[in-house]
Each structure stands twice: as structure tokens, then as C-alpha cells.
Design a protein with these regions (language model features):
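Positively charged n-region of N-terminal signal peptides that target proteins for export
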Residues: 1-4
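C-terminal motif of bacterial Sec signal peptides marking the signal peptidase cleavage site
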Residues: 15-18
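Calycin-type beta-barrel ligand-binding domains and close structural analogs
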Residues: 20-38, 46-52, 57-202
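Long, low-complexity intrinsically disordered regions enriched in Ser/Thr, Asp/Glu, Pro/Gly
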Residues: 7-13
Length: 202
């Protein structure tokens, strides 16, 4: 793909995790998917935020993820938990129903592109903690090393969004290479189970 005319980034939780890089291709392959039942249930951000993250089983190695923000707006995703080396990641991909439900013409919708995002899972119990690839770090790194990984930059300066266009194998190599690179991953996202969920898991 030489040019991306429009990228629809259906990550309603951008405010929580910060603006994040997205990818045309998934981080996972069929061989490294794992399923951990500990992820199932409803989680909420620590602090005053009222947003929730709800995970349901959708298959042997797939979750349905529903994000609800402070204003009650929702976004539904296909979620896959995977292992990259010894590290677990959560790959998120917007559910097609989000586009189908838009009050727009079919011609408009064919120009919208769903993309993947991924979060490094540092722990699930007793609280869910994840980190995203830091967009600012990635911008600066690619300015210095533009051939490190195939990508497309949309916009300029601090507002620029990075869409990774590399194949899944190349994407995995890049992420694994920078697992311990200082600044490559952002501040942790800390989530705790909703009280009712905590009781049901005892």
C-alpha cells in the first residue's frame, strides 16, 4: 500500500492510553496465541475515571473487548492475547460492526481502514497492567532511523500519527528488539476489577 488516504482509528480509549501507534497487520500469528481466563471480566481504571474495559470469551483463543469511556461511548474490538518471546501482548482490532453501524454511504465506508493496536501486558493479577508503544518515542526513533520498519506518517510534528505497514514477522522483530529500549513503552495503564467482578472470581 503506497498511500493511505484515510485511517479510521477506532480506539476510543486513546485518552486513557495516550495516542498510540497503529498497525496494518496484527502482532500475532496463529502459533503464539494464548488464552488466559484471568483476563475475563470487567475492569476499570484506577482513580476517578469511570471508563471500563470488559473482556468476554469469543473463541478458543479470542476475546471480545468492549471499551466504555467516561461519557458512556463504546467501542467493540476483537482481542487476542499472544506471547512474543517471554512477553505477553494484547492485540486489539476494531469490530466491523462499528463501521457497519455508521450512518454513512457505502462509498464512504470503503475508504475507512481498520487498524491494529497492541499493548504489552506486564501482569493480569491482582490488577491488570499494560503499556503501549510510546508514540513520541516512535516518531523520534523513525526520524533518525526511517528504514527501521515500514511505516506511514500522517500529519506533522507532535500531531503526527504513525501507522506501521510492515508485515507481521517484521513487526514482531521490531517490537521484540525494543522490549527493553528505554522510553519505547509509555506509562503503565493500571486497571482493577470492578467490585462485583472481584467477588465473582473468589
Amino acid at each position: 500500500m503506497k498511500k493511505i488516504l484515510l485511517v479510521l482509528v477506532l480506539v476510543a480509549f486513546c485518552v486513557v492510553v495516550g495516542c498510540i501507534p497503529t498497525s496494518i497487520n496484527p502482532l500475532y500469528t496463529g502459533q503464539d496465541l494464548v488464552f488466559d481466563p484471568a483476563l475475563l471480566g470487567v475492569w476499570r481504571s484506577e482513580g476517578d475515571s469511570k471508563d471500563t474495559w470488559a473482556f468476554e470469551k469469543a473463541g478458543d483463543s479470542e476475546y471480545k473487548f468492549l471499551y466504555t469511556d467516561d461519557e458512556g461511548k463504546t467501542g467493540q474490538f476483537e482481542a487476542h492475547l499472544l506471547k512474543l518471546g517471554h512477553t505477553r501482548f494484547l492485540d486489539l482490532f476494531p469490530d466491523e460492526s462499528g463501521i457497519e453501524g455508521m450512518d454513512r454511504s457505502g462509498y464512504y465506508k470503503i475508504h475507512l481502514l481498520r487498524t491494529h493496536s497492541f499493548l504489552k501486558v506486564t501482569r493480569i493479577e491482582p490488577a491488570l497492567q499494560m503499556e503501549s508503544l510510546d508514540l513520541k518515542w516512535l516518531r523520534e526513533f523513525l526520524e533518525k532511523h526511517p528504514n527501521a520498519i515500514r511505516h506511514h506518517k500522517i500529519g506533522e510534528g507532535d500531531e503526527a500519527q504513525i501507522v506501521l505497514t510492515a508485515s507481521t514477522p517484521d513487526l514482531r522483530k521490531f517490537v521484540e528488539k525494543h522490549l527493553k529500549t528505554e522510553g519505547a513503552f509509555g506509562e503503565p495503564i493500571n486497571l482493577k476489577r470492578k467490585q462485583s467482578e472481584t467477588k465473582s472470581h473468589k
